[in-house]
Amino acid sequence: MSLPSIPSFVLSGLLLICLPFSSFASATTSHISFSYAARQRMQNRARLLKQYQTHLKKQASYIVEGNAESKRALRQHNREQIKQHPEWFPAPLKASDRRWQALAENNHFLSSDHLHNITEVAIHRLEQQLGKPYVWGGTRPDKGFDCSGLVFYAYNKILEAKLPRTANEMYHYRRATIVANNDLRRGDLLFFHIHSREIADHMGVYLGDGQFIESPRTGETIRISRLAEPFWQDHFLGARRILTEETIL
């Protein structure tokens, strides 16, 4: 027995009825998929934002804004920490100490006890290296130093911002103050041009009484020299002051 044929207009009607349901189902599925993906993105963004906010809170404990008040607070905090480590400082200078006499004779008194102590820390570190060999590129007491490496080693742990590495970079360092030849103070950096008239390719640290400590050249050892010697006078470029109340820890 054959099935009755379905009129074409009935088939057309059924097709029109089914198509909306099919489109609706497809759209619903797509909408669900889109909503899930959107929620996932939002959750991921929220998680990343929370992680970033946590990171900022941790950073806040040691990030210092660039205003004078916060910098003063940081220096005071650092000084309190330094007080807890007296072993960082050399023995106090006695009235008979030649180094104190040099300061008194030159009438170049430091502006505070803290600045004086910090300066002596640097000088003490420098003098501990006397007799050690010159090593080009050296920055370590167990290996040796070149001229700027010696200063880099002795000064960077007591400064808010690290010094650059080479003598010429230190000579042009913006945080350093230009010092007149008749105003030299213990701890000032001295610069010389040995191989060029325009570039600072050697340096030392002024100790007072016309003396400075230096790591001279290959084959020599770290020593104390006199600035008044003709060789140094002929090659002297100038002095810079990096140890001040504003630059030290």
Curated annotation (Swiss-Prot):
Q: Which residues form the active site?
A: 147 (nucleophile), 202 (proton acceptor), 214
- Please name the GO terms of the biological process aspect recorded for this protein, alphabetically: peptidoglycan metabolic process; proteolysis
Molecular function terms from GO: cysteine-type peptidase activity; endopeptidase activity
Signal peptide span per the entry? Answer: 1-17
A Pfam family hit? NLPC_P60
SUPFAM superfamilies membership:
Cysteine proteinases
User: So what EC number does this one have?
Assistant: 3.4.-.-
Lipid addition sites, S-diacylglycerol cysteine: 18
Q: Where is the NlpC/P60 domain?
A: 116-243
The membrane topology term of the UniProt record is:
Lipid-anchor
Keywords attached to this entry: Cell membrane, Hydrolase, Lipoprotein, Membrane, Palmitate, Protease, Signal, Thiol protease
Write out the GO cellular component annotations: plasma membrane
State its location(s): Cell membrane
The parts of the chain that form a coiled coil are none
Q: Does the keyword Ion transport apply?
A: no
Q: Where is the lipid attached (N-palmitoyl cysteine)?
A: 18
Q: Which InterPro entries match?
A: NLP_P60_dom, Papain-like_cys_pep_sf, Peptidase_C40
Write out the similarity annotation.
Answer: Belongs to the peptidase C40 family.
Q: What is this protein called?
A: Probable endopeptidase YafL
Annotated organism of origin: Escherichia coli (strain K12)
